Amino acid sequence: MQVILLDKIAKLGGLGDQVSVKAGYARNYLIPQGKAVMATKANIETFDARRAELEAKLAAGKAAAEERAAKLGELAAVVIASKSGDEGKLFGSIGTRDVAEAITAAGVAVAKSEVRMGNVLRNTGDYEVVVQLHADVKATVQIQVVAL
């Protein structure tokens, strides 16, 4: 199925690219999320008329993400306290939701979906967590897990 992208999508393309994707991906994700429209003649003409408006909207979103990244860069280490055993092993784990809540409590609003972690944190110590604020903007935050 041919679609026109209205946003930059990782591993697919940028604004205005006409790409071929599987029908289910287009119908169930791209089109309902407002990230693409079907590539019909009418939609192509409409897109060409709105291209400048969409590019300005995309640039504004990236500028806002860069501003948030600068605020995240200014943060000192974010401390998360959790119950742990004698050897520093946590009772439970710290996941993306816990990290997002701690960063938000520190003063910069971050959604759970923006936090990128390989695994959950299961021990006390210092960690670096990547926060993906935009397709092109990433920030690294220092997380310090301490025992209660």
Curated annotation (Swiss-Prot):
Record carries keyword Ribonucleoprotein: yes
InterPro entries, alphabetized: Ribosomal_bL9 (IPR000244), Ribosomal_bL9/RNase_H1_N (IPR009027), Ribosomal_bL9_bac/chp (IPR020594), Ribosomal_bL9_C (IPR020069), Ribosomal_bL9_C_sf (IPR036791), Ribosomal_bL9_N (IPR020070), Ribosomal_bL9_N_sf (IPR036935)
Keywords: Ribonucleoprotein, Ribosomal protein, RNA-binding, rRNA-binding
Annotated protein name in UniProt: Large ribosomal subunit protein bL9
Biological role stated in the UniProt entry: Binds to the 23S rRNA.
This protein's GO CC annotations: ribonucleoprotein complex; ribosome
Signal peptide residue numbers: none
Pfam families in UniProt: Ribosomal_L9_C, Ribosomal_L9_N
Single GO biological process annotation from the record: translation
Membership in a protein family: Belongs to the bacterial ribosomal protein bL9 family.
Record bears the keyword rRNA-binding: yes
Molecular function via GO: rRNA binding; structural constituent of ribosome
